[in-house]
Amino acid sequence: LDKNRQTRILSVFEGAIYNGFFLITQGFLGTGLALEFGASEPAIALIGVLPSVSQFIQLLAPSFLRIVKSRKRAMMICAFASRLSTAFIPIALALGINGQSLLLTILAFFSLAASLTGNYWVSIIRDVAPLKGAARFFSMRNVIFTFTNMFITLFYAFILDLVPGRMGFILITAFGVASALVSLVLLGFHNDPPHEISHGRGLFRAVTKDIRFKPYLRFYSFWSFSIVITSPFFAYHELVNMKLDYSFLSILNVFSSLLTILFYLLWGKIADKIGSQAVLEFGVLGAFLKTILWLFMDTGTVYLLYIDAFIGTASWSAINLCLFTTMLDLLSGVDAQSYALLSFTNGASALVGSLVGGFFAAYLNRFTWMVGGHRFFGIQILFFVTFVLKRLFDFLEGSQDEKGGLCVGNGF
């Protein structure tokens, strides 16, 4: 078994186990954890987008790499810092120290260090993943993640319903910490092929001169901004306004996960035939269209969640698979510098979007009204805003593919 193949296999196990903690910070589990710490709507918005906002620190990735002189060493230092910090969450809950500022601080530190870890991991995996059939490799990797995430989510939801309140979150965060530490050990066995370390001059100038990459960069920043305005509040609406329990949400997650597995297999084969960009464009369209359903989500229309799950899994499986592989196609080589610029742009856009979304969510959720027997919540206005922004971007973007760039406007 050659070292590169061994690293590819390890990357699957490492990622699946690592999600034992990461899932606690996302979706309805992350929202529930934030509410357990007494988080307000703006704080929930920030917590929900910390993985994106933390990518500001990517600008330091090339400099740190030059200091330590090894991608693997840099990755392990950052991974050690991020995953060890997770232990403070169950400790804080056990001691009854549950202020939202503390949770924000812990998760911010975790996300910053994890963001740098991801930078070096992407650079390494680009050198060990097969150039031919990359989409199929990552689709199979994502299928395995979907299976493990499904069982982890069910397990955590079962604990939270069996042991409600603070004790339930102490238990699942303790499991999450154990997962994070095991994944750290597996990272240590990754192979780092020989790689020339760039001196990092002209970071913005070199990448933005690429006429194929510039439209992708512009699309990625607008995508991040418009998505994070609402992304933390879907689960918030389910838990607070619709008052759904964790068991139901976990069952819905199983339904979505099973569909996701099928779509990952489908998109992996299609992307290798027609290209990742075409599949990505379809996914983006579906992700925006599904937000319209959330205008009608309340306790009397729970069945719409299943329709939303179908559209969402078809769309997000395409996005999760092809957003990364499209980047691999557009960049001649995914080094720390080019990935840092992309991540910085994503972080800046996500920060602005989360601040805008958090501010309006705190204000809008005070209002409810009845129309034709249907109860509307003020926060649902934000869901419609995402769709409007997408159509506005299409109008402003126009024809962007004439010079070989990413077709954002005409692709739909």
PLM feature spans:
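Juxtamembrane intracellular "pre-TM" segments in multi-pass secondary transporters
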Residues: 1-5, 192-220, 404-412
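Helix-loop boundary and gating motifs at the non-cytosolic
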Residues: 1-58, 62-65, 72, 87, ...
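Cytoplasmic membrane-interface "Motif A"-like loop-to-helix N-cap segments
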Residues: 67-82, 140, 165-167, 272-285, ...
